[in-house]
């Protein structure tokens, strides 16, 4: 969404992720975005990019030259990403992320960086576009490249159509039929209290935080192109993606830089928000539902974002059935971790049903062996009493419509509203 709004830093993050996990066909074929300028810039700028070899690239699909070019493109956009993130962090001290401008913390004399008091040697020391005096400043070539990419993303008709659908149909959270749905987490302090965020010179937490985030996101698309509100909304979309304890991210920080440049595995750890220490407790889930105005005894929280590690014995139901985790789905990078290809939750008048899916074997094998995605119902949780239409959100709307129609009919019958007859 941030990329579609024209945010250069979000575009860099999108391209970084697509290259890392070999999803560039989505960008080029799906959305018709031309990456030739990036390829030309990368091939002319970088020599060594072995550390940026795509994580899940298929050797059968690419030649060694293709992989070499992809690696250089990957490195080029990563360096641009780190520069733009450093600039954004400097613009917004209220995000409390000054320690995450890692490019500015590199000691370019001996090519080391100190994190949490420990000095680490960098695994890649080639930085032809980085000025040690101004590490986050883009070169003129990088600026030209990003202008082209911003124009391409903003003028992709299909991408804009898809993001418009998300804006008009989606939200930060949804209360539906006494269920609370959200993607990441409701940020908490270590003691379990709601974490406060200072945004626009005001403090927000819990439901108020989600409501305010929703407003800021929409400003990134609905205001004038060069307005300060739009610029803040674009930066805030990046914060939601990977900002400290963001409700959509739910971690202290993202370790993209460390995974590329530092060997020590302890630096790759992304500490989760305290929410994940409490979301298995039934009492906490009941209180969280109340925070969003839901008190029904059958209410559930439907929580995304965190993969369910089935191979380690984890399951999608937590807190005595008050919370359902539905995530870690069709993303190939997670399937080796989870052991499955995600879950689907079905909600009906009888209760909920959760199906687990096995990874897709691929088009060739499907056609050869006439196989499909294998799914199995793993959980059934029936309600004590069947839910009738009148008790659902749709039923409540129908009741309101009936009351309005009856009031209108009464107004006509009593003469409050005169009927007009056409001759």
Task: Show which residues each predicted segment covers.
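Feature recognizes metal-dependent phosphohydrolase scaffolds
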Residues: 1-423
């Amino acid at each position: 969404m941030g990329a579609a709004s024209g945010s250069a830093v979000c575009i860099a993050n999108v391209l970084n992720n697509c290259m890392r996990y070999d999803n560039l066909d989505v960008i080029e074929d799906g959305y018709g975005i031309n990456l030739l300028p990036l390829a030309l810039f990368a091939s002319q700028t970088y020599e060594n990019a072995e550390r940026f070899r795509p994580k899940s690239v298929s050797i059968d699909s690419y030649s060694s030259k293709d992989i070499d070019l992809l690696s250089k493109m990957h490195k080029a956009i990563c360096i641009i990403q780190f520069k733009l993130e450093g600039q954004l962090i400097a613009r917004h001290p209220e995000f409390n992320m000054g320690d995450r401008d890692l490019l500015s913390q590199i000691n370019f004399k001996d090519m080391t960086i100190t994190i949490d008091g420990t000095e680490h040697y960098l695994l890649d020391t080639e930085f032809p576009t980085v000025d040690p005096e101004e590490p986050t400043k883009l070169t003129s070539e990088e600026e030209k490249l990003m202008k082209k990419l911003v124009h391409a993303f903003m003028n992709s008709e299909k991408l804009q159509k898809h993001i418009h659908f998300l804006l008009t149909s989606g939200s930060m959270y949804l209360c539906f039929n006494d269920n609370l749905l959200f993607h990441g987490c409701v940020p908490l302090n270590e003691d379990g209290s709601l974490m406060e965020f200072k945004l626009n010179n005001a403090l927000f937490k819990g439901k108020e935080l989600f409501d305010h985030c929703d407003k800021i996101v929409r400003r990134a698309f609905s205001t004038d192109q060069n307005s300060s509100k739009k610029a803040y909304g674009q930066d805030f979309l990046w914060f939601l993606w990977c900002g400290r304890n963001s409700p959509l991210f739910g971690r202290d920080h993202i370790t993209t830089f460390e995974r590329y440049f530092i060997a020590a595995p302890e630096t790759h750890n992304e500490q989760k928000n305290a929410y994940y220490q409490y979301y298995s407790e039934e009492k906490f889930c009941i209180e969280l539902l109340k925070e969003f105005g839901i008190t029904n005894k059958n209410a559930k929280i439907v929580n995304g974002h965190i993969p369910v590690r089935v191979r380690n014995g984890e399951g999608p139901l937590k807190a005595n059935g008050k919370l359902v985790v539905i995530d870690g789905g069709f993303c190939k990078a997670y399937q080796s971790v989870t052991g499955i290809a995600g879950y689907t939750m079905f909600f009906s008048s009888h209760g909920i049903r959760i199906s687990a899916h096995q990874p897709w074997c691929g088009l060739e094998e499907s056609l050869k062996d006439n196989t499909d995605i294998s799914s199995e119902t793993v959980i059934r949780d029936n309600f004590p009493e069947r839910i009738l239409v009148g008790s659902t959100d749709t039923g409540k709307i129908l009741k309101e419509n009936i009351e309005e129609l009856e009031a209108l009919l009464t107004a006509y019958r009593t003469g409050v509203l005169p009927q007009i007859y056409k001759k």
